[in-house]
């Protein structure tokens, strides 16, 4: 099972919107993890100005995104992995 990470931050209203979108999508084929951007220096250095960010393997989807972009991102990455 592939790990899908949502990078978030405390009091991030866009992150809350992203989480609501993800709750509308079937993520049964993924191990979903909500990760604070401050938990790893690499996340903070790379994505501090882009959150929310979805990470799957070595691919990323940065905000803004909607339900259709998320589904496309997941399908594309499943086919390529």
Could you say what each language-model-derived stretch is?
Residues 56-81:
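Non-catalytic, surface beta->alpha helical segment in thiol-disulfide oxidoreductase systems
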Residues 17-20, 45-46, 65:
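Generic recognition of short, well-ordered alpha-helical segments
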Residues 7, 35, 58, 62:
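Small/polar loops that bind or transfer phosphate-bearing groups
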Residues 45-54:
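Structural micro-motif
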Residues 1-24:
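Local sequence-structure signature of Cys/Sec-based thiol-disulfide redox active-site neighborhoods
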Residues 19-37:
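Conserved helix-turn-beta segment immediately C-terminal to the redox Cys motif
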């Amino acid at each position: 099972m592939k790990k899908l990470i949502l990078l978030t931050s405390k009091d991030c209203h866009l992150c809350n919107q992203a989480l609501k979108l993800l709750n509308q999508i079937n993520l049964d084929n993924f191990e979903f993890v909500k990760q604070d951007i401050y938990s790893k220096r690499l996340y903070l250095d790379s994505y501090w100005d882009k959150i929310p960010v979805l990470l799957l393997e070595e691919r990323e989807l940065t905000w803004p995104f909607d339900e259709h972009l998320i589904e496309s991102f997941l399908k594309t990455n499943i086919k390529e992995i």
